[in-house]
């Protein structure tokens, strides 16, 4: 061969051809083509990465948006099913896993088959006899991945559940830190957090060790296959059946094929964790919302004043066998205050939570201005309500944004009027920025009483037809409570006012007091009437009022 090459070269030189120059030109042209293809491949790779990242980000954004919209529409039934910590994990960590897998699929799953097919086509032109070596390599890789699947797959769901648990423990500790310090139980809470943290760390270490085992095993397979190709190829070269260049090309193409399968297998290993995350997100998205708008909603009368009526209402929580409320019937009229009182756990808060449809009644119906609340859209219903929960809830922003939360288009005069009625002006005026004073997350920089007054002001600024105060005056002192209710009475002359209370003093002057005991109405009337007709109410009053106050009230009735 070498002699033939030398002879041909000498013949070219004899006829005047410069073989050296020709070789140089050929090398330069081929090198330029190779550089061009490499640059094109680099540009295509960068473009593919950018497009994959863009698509992945959009997938993540869409899932977060859909999950958030779904959660916003949850009733209390769904919130009882999914813990807050779990919903946060599903909306962040789980969606991030899905987003990461989406990017990897677009970058690798489309690229790897093309690379594998190209490698197979090239190998078929070099030496088909050693193709069984590539098949052996692929088989070994699949076996390694299958073992990892069997070992690791069941652990991924446990990992996500443990993340939920750790988030729950962290949230409980952070929100309850003042109580923890007051009872000096920091050590116990540290141990509780450490246990959740160690359990998660231990399982993560197991999963990561199993995953770490994969790459060295894959490299061992690749190096072993290279040695096998050299060994088999060496014998073929020795027998004259193969050239050294063909063997080197076969090694390169074989590595290309094996790498493509390796990349697909790596995606396959990521798939179980993302599949668990996708399943958890899907649980939220596909959860059936118990409270939904009717297909053909009705509208409230334009001249309605918000009269609320309960007609033989009974209710039990999902999964519970016994009713929490039994055959509740009453009417709350505009311009009047209807109060609910009773022992702890008698169903007062549950009753008022049925009006905005946080839950739906089990039996009977609730009407506003004669329309069943289930026949209205949730927006139309809640637009008529001003709700103040037991625990004051504030949002990050400032005092003004919190007061005008339900009426963002309201005027400054409406805001100051609401603050004055809620007795919030006295502490707002002490702040340098007054209504622009910042409110930290959850209202952590204001006291419980201030938080409650701002929550009341928020409801007043909305100008609703129906006010619902769910034990909202409990954080106020007696003086503030009295002045606030007096100012509120003047403001709500045309509105329905529903008050859940523990203190008799809060509801003394209510036009209608409903006494609940074990979910049933055991008394209905004014303060003076109930002292004579309802033993349960009398016992509550006797525990809070002096004997002279009781006698005076009973004389007024006489």
Describe the residue ranges of each PLM region.
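Juxtamembrane helix-loop junctions of ABC transporter transmembrane domains
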Residues: 28, 37-84, 88, 92, ...
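Residue-level recognition of pore/gate-forming positions within transmembrane alpha-helices
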Residues: 38, 108, 112, 138-142
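Helix-loop junctions and hydrophobic alpha-helical segments within the transmembrane domains
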Residues: 67, 71, 180, 193, ...
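Pre-NBD coupling/linker segments of ABC/ABC-like ATPases
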Residues: 289-303
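An intracellular "coupling" helix at the cytosolic face of ABC transporter transmembrane type-1 domains
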Residues: 76-77, 93-102, 106, 110, ...
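Transmembrane-helix motif of ABC transporter permease domains
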Residues: 1-60, 80, 133, 144-147, ...
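Helix-loop-helix
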Residues: 118, 122-139, 143, 206-280, ...
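ABC-type nucleotide-binding domain
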Residues: 301-558
């Amino acid at each position: 061969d070498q002699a033939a090459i030398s002879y041909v070269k000498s013949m070219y030189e004899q006829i005047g051809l410069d073989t050296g120059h020709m070789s140089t030109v050929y090398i330069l042209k081929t090198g330029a083509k190779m550089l061009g293809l490499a640059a094109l491949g680099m540009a295509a790779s960068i473009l593919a990465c950018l497009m994959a990242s863009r698509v992945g980000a959009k997938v993540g954004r869409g899932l977060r948006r859909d999950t958030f919209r779904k959660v916003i529409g949850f009733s209390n039934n769904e919130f009882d099913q999914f813990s807050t910590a779990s919903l946060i994990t599903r909306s962040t960590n789980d969606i991030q896993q899905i987003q990461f897998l989406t990017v990897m699929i677009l970058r690798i799953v489309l690229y790897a088959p093309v690379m594998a097919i190209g490698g197979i086509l090239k190998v078929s032109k070099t030496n088909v006899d050693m193709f069984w070596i590539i098949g052996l390599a692929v088989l070994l890789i699949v076996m390694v991945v299958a073992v990892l699947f069997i070992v690791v797959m069941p652990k991924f769901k446990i990992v996500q559940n443990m993340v939920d648990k750790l988030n729950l423990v962290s949230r409980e500790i952070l929100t309850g830190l003042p109580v923890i310090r007051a009872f000096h139980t920091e050590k116990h809470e540290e141990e509780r957090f450490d246990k959740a943290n160690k359990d998660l760390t231990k399982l993560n270490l197991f999963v990561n060790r199993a995953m770490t085992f994969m790459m060295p095993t894959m490299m061992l397979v690749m190096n072993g296959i290279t040695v096998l190709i050299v060994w088999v190829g060496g014998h073929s070269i020795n027998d004259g059946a193969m050239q050294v260049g063909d063997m080197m090309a076969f090694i390169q193409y074989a590595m290309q094929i094996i790498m493509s399968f390796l990349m697909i297998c790596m995606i396959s290993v990521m798939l179980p964790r993302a599949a668990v995350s996708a399943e958890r997100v899907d649980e939220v998205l596909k959860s059936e919302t118990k409270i939904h708008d009717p297909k053909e909603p009705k509208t409230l009368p334009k001249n309605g004043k918000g009269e609320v009526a309960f007609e033989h209402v009974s209710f039990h929580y999902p999964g519970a066998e016994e009713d929490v409320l039994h055959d509740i019937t009453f009417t709350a009229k505009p311009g009047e205050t209807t109060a609910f009182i009773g022992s702890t756990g008698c169903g007062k808060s549950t009753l008022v939570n049925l009006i905005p449809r946080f839950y739906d009644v089990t039996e009977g119906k609730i009407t506003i201005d004669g329309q069943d609340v289930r026949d209205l859209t949730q927006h139309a219903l809640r637009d008529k309500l001003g709700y103040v929960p037991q625990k004051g809830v504030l949002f990050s922003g400032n005092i003004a944004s919190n007061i005008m939360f339900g009426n963002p288009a309201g005027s400054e005069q409406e805001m100051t009027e609401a603050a004055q009625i809620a007795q919030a002006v006295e502490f707002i005026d002490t702040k340098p920025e007054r209504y622009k004073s910042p409110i930290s997350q959850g209202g952590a920089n204001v006291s419980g009483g201030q938080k409650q007054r701002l929550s009341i002001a928020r409801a007043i600024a909305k100008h609703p037809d129906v006010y619902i105060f769910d034990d909202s005056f409990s954080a106020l002192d007696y003086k503030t409570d009295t002045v606030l209710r007096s100012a509120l009475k003047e403001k709500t002359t045309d509105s329905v006012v529903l008050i859940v209370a523990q203190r008799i003093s809060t509801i003394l002057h209510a036009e209608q007091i409903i006494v609940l005991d074990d979910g049933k109405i055991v008394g209905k009337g004014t303060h003076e009437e109930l002292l004579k007709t309802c033993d349960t109410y009398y016992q509550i009053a006797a525990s809070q009022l002096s004997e002279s106050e009781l006698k005076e009230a009973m004389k007024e009735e006489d």
